């Protein structure tokens, strides 16, 4: 068999926030609350510009690696102490941090949403935007749904395949957009792309 080393260290959770790295004082200055993240709900007062002063009662120093305060905290109640420098208000909120992979998924959704907004703006609403994340069936179904659904009224579609993990979706995408089968791929005597 193949040797695989065991996991070492802690899994570091994430609060679902983007930070202002130009902030030089104590704490973490919030630049953005990522959509669908732990603080993105109606009861939270978390907004861009506030400072996270403490996590579970531990003060975040100016040069401190705050990540250690989130080790092994995914889906566990975590107390976050917040300060709003504009209103001078301090408060605490309890959240359930998410895993790094869950945060990466949120960042991907944010990236796609921002690209779609750019395309809509630059084309004056004439073009839609889809990103093909991977060359597999779930990604194809999402593209198909977007093209025939929310972008049905558009004059064209920007198809983005950057950072695509690869696969065998190219035939399906070509047929979707052209209506014609341009290739028959035969592997060991059987058509593999029907």
Give names to the regions the model predicted.
Residues 2, 6-8, 29-38, 58-194:
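Cleft-lining beta-strand/loop regions that shape enzyme active-site pockets
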Residues 18-34:
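PDZ/PDZ-like groove recognition
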Residues 47-53:
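Structural motif
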């Amino acid at each position: 068999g193949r040797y695989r080393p065991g996991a070492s260290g802690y899994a570091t959770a994430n609060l679902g926030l983007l930070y202002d790295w130009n902030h030089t004082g104590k704490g973490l200055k919030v630049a953005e609350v990522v959509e669908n993240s732990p603080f993105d709900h109606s009861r939270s007062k978390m907004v861009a510009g506030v400072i996270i002063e403490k996590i579970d009662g531990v003060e975040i120093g100016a040069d401190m690696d705050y990540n250690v305060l989130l080790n092994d905290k995914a889906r566990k109640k975590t107390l976050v102490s917040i300060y709003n420098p504009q209103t001078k208000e301090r408060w605490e909120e309890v959240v359930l941090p998410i895993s790094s992979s869950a945060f990466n998924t949120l960042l991907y959704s944010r990236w796609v949403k921002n690209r779609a907004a750019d395309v809509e703006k630059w084309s004056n609403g004439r073009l839609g935007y889809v990103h093909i994340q991977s060359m597999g069936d779930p990604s194809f179904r999402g593209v198909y749904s977007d093209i025939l659904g929310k972008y049905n009224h558009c004059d064209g579609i920007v198809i983005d395949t950057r950072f695509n993990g690869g696969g065998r979706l190219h035939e399906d995408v070509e047929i979707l957009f052209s209506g014609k089968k341009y290739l028959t791929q035969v592997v060991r005597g059987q058509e593999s792309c029907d």
